[in-house]
Amino acid sequence: MSGDSSGRRPEGRGRGRDPHRDRTRSRSRSRSPLSPGSRRGAAPERREAPERPGLEDTEPSDSGDEMIDPASLEEETDPSLCRQIRHQYRALINSVQQNREDILNASDKLTEVLEEANTLFNGVSRAREAVLDAHFLVLASDLGKEKAKQLRSDLNSFDMLRYVETLLTHMGVNPLEAEELIRDEDSSDLEFIVYDSWKISGKTAENTFNKTHTFHFLLGSIQGECPVPKPRIERPRKVRMIEEQQAMPAQLKRMEESHQEATEKEVERILGLLQTYFQEDPDTPMSFFDFVVDPHSFPRTVENIFHVSFIIRDGFARIRLDRDRLPVIEPVNINEESGGNTQIRNQAIIALSYRDWEEIVRTFEISEPVITSSQSQQRLSA
């Protein structure tokens, strides 16, 4: 009933507008709110001050005219008519408060009260009457809420006993007979009745379920035997691959041994060249760059530095700085070697790029290499 009452009230208000008041509003909309003639009896200081637009000034009218002036509307309303409307509203509110229990128990009493309030609202034009109407709406909404609580709804309730009785009746089981069989524990008829009853219930319930597809085995029936996997036959090609893999490490080992022997021979040859040079001129030191740099080949220069590093590591030669802070190399005698074991040895890394090699050749004016390539090394490089 609260839904019907709330739906009727706006329709009564919309249809019950006073035509005389609508004409008055359209007449007052043509006036500007800030013009001197829009407010009667207003002070000059009040007219000069800018006014903030109210809620009624921002709402557009149905006819497309300007906004309504509330002051002019109140002045044109009959005071006696407004007084009568307020008196009727107060009487209606008092009646609702006194007859609250009757309205809650009756079926159409709340609807009649709302229709009466809609009739009174047709003559409301000022805020005082609108306040009384709002007060009545609060009372009416409380009454509607109370009537809604009185409505009985069984959507969320579940009566278990009633459900069991209905289920037993559908299964064809007499509740009295079932109680006697339950009390008699030695009776064998209970299992038959229970099984037969659930069978009836299952047939009824299976109509509401979708049937699922059965499982089909890819190999046929369950008792079938799985096929025996065929044994793999080893091919002779795999045996040849294993023999080749066993032969490869031996071949690589021989190649590594040949390179190692060539490196040892080259180191001994370079040491012999250094010792021969110092035997011919023992007072003149040999520049390290003049000794290892090959002006015609950058890779050959790198190989010479690599081979000389073994001579320095084994203690057959040493590198020191001369007066110009440039590195020189000289062989070490056997007597000096035995006495120099207590000296601290330093390890260094030489970084040489192609540009550095060109600059060294140009600065030291190296034209011919001191370490010439041997025939065995030429054969290996070829």
From Swiss-Prot:
GO terms for cellular component: chromosome, telomeric region; nuclear body; nucleus; Smc5-Smc6 complex
Post-translational modification Phosphoserine, affected residues: 374
Localization per record: Nucleus; Chromosome, Telomere
Residue stretches of biased makeup (Low complexity): 31-41
Basic and acidic residues bias (residue ranges): 1-21, 42-55
UniProt keyword annotations, A-Z: Chromosome, DNA damage, DNA recombination, DNA repair, Nucleus, Phosphoprotein, Telomere
Principal subcellular localization: nucleus
Pfam family, one: Nse4-Nse3_bdg
Record bears the keyword Disulfide bond: no
Entry-annotated residues carrying Phosphothreonine: 342
Cited InterPro entries: Nse4/EID, Nse4_C, Nse4_Nse3-bd
Compositional bias of kind Acidic residues: 56-78
GO biological process: DNA damage response; DNA recombination; DNA repair
Residue ranges of the region described as Disordered: 1-80
Protein family membership: Belongs to the NSE4 family.
Quaternary structure, from the entry: Component of the SMC5-SMC6 complex which consists at least of SMC5, SMC6, NSMCE2, NSMCE1, NSMCE4A or EID3 and NSMCE3. NSMCE1, NSMCE4A or EID3 and NSMCE3 probably form a subcomplex that bridges the head domains of the SMC5:SMC6 heterodimer. Interacts with NSMCE3.
Function in brief: Component of the SMC5-SMC6 complex, a complex involved in repair of DNA double-strand breaks by homologous recombination. The complex may promote sister chromatid homologous recombination by recruiting the SMC1-SMC3 cohesin complex to double-strand breaks. The complex is required for telomere maintenance via recombination and mediates sumoylation of shelterin complex (telosome) components.
Protein name in the entry: Non-structural maintenance of chromosomes element 4 homolog A
